[in-house]
């Protein structure tokens, strides 16, 4: 119970950090999307530096854990949701509310107009890049390489137009459309796509190793 609560708290902090990155992306969405995508990486940088629990990152390591890890992932997902909502609440209580809400609503409108299949596959693509980012940070022996992996992975997934479930939690919350049937359904579909995407490269590596490569 105590461990589960600690996991949940670290997940709340991770969702909050993704909201931090989402803030700067919304601020620059209509003026300098490239810079916004680069600076969004402050969220993942903070998460990896402080060993926080981000659903999209942790999903990449399902194959390295016991089946009970899936329950831990559900706790992390819920914690990320709480953290993203906390950041959205702070935005709504500030002078940033109007401009950020307008920007978030434009992003959410695109997602709501998309098909569930498209959102799933965009989630797959996104978390393939997140795996590159987090595993690069984990395994690269050089500090510069660690942080380049994070920055490049995040920047590419944003500019490519893919779907990150926790960032989307934040955008839906700011747009005021999170707790609707449509919003929650899309988040679940994107989350499932993220799980599949996070497993593609590690599963491929394990298969290649099993075949003697």
PLM ranges: what are they?
Residues 1-213:
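Alpha-helical transmembrane segments and their helix-helix packing motifs
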């Amino acid at each position: 119970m105590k461990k589960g609560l600690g996991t949940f708290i670290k997940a709340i902090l991770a969702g909050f950090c993704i909201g931090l990155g989402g803030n700067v992306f919304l601020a620059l969405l209509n003026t300098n999307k490239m810079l916004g995508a680069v600076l969004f990486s402050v969220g993942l940088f903070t998460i990896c530096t402080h060993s926080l629990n981000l659903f999209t990152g942790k999903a990449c390591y399902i194959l390295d854990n016991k089946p009970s890890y899936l329950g831990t992932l559900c706790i992390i997902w819920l914690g990320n949701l709480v953290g993203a909502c906390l950041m959205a609440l702070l935005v709504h209580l500030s002078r940033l509310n109007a401009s950020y809400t307008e920007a978030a609503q434009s992003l959410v409108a695109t997602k709501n107009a998309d098909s569930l299949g498209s959102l799933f596959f965009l989630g797959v693509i996104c978390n393939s890049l997140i795996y590159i980012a987090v595993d690069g940070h984990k395994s690269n022996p050089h500090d510069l390489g660690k942080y380049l992996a994070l920055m490049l992975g995040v920047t590419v997934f944003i500019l490519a137009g893919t779907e990150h479930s926790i960032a989307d939690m934040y955008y839906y919350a700011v747009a005021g459309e999170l707790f609707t049937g449509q919003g929650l359904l899309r988040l679940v579909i994107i989350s499932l796509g993220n799980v599949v995407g996070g497993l593609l490269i590690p599963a491929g590596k394990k298969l290649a190793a099993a075949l003697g490569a």
